[in-house]
Amino acid sequence: MLKPLGDRVIVEVVEEEEQTVGGIVLANNAKQKPQTGKVVAVGEGALTPEGKRLPMAVKVGDTVLYDKYAGSEVKYEGQDYLVLHEKDIMAIA
């Protein structure tokens, strides 16, 4: 598994539904980037100028909401992940 550094978090992408509630099937280009994911790895936290580690607010297993343009997409062992800074996470569900 990937090990994030600093205040980074690795999130497993949760795909959006391909069909709307009304039954309309969305084309791939009509779907927006997913905004929900499951935390699979957490860094040790950011360092302060004094060298102290700031604790992370999220933990492995949390479901998080993030901005649709946040993070860097990576593919690792056939699975899609996002690498986010903790500040890019808007909420824990």
Swiss-Prot record:
Record flagged with keyword Chaperone: yes
Annotated protein name in UniProt: Co-chaperonin GroES
Subunit comment: Heptamer of 7 subunits arranged in a ring. Interacts with the chaperonin GroEL.
Keywords: Chaperone, Cytoplasm
Family of the protein in this entry: Belongs to the GroES chaperonin family.
Keyword Cytoplasm: yes
Pfam families: Cpn10
UniProt GO cellular component terms: cytoplasm
Role: Together with the chaperonin GroEL, plays an essential role in assisting protein folding. The GroEL-GroES system forms a nano-cage that allows encapsulation of the non-native substrate proteins and provides a physical environment optimized to promote and accelerate protein folding. GroES binds to the apical surface of the GroEL ring, thereby capping the opening of the GroEL channel.
Gene from which the chain derives: groES
InterPro entries named among the record's database cross-references: Chaperonin_GroES, Chaperonin_GroES_sf, Chaprnonin_Cpn10_CS, GroES-like_sf
Classification via NCBIfam families: PRK00364.2-2, PRK00364.2-4, PRK00364.2-5
GO MF annotations, alphabetized: ATP binding; metal ion binding; protein folding chaperone; protein-folding chaperone binding; unfolded protein binding
Subcellular location: Cytoplasm
Organism in which the protein naturally occurs: Lacticaseibacillus paracasei (strain ATCC 334 / BCRC 17002 / CCUG 31169 / CIP 107868 / KCTC 3260 / NRRL B-441)
GO BP: chaperone cofactor-dependent protein refolding
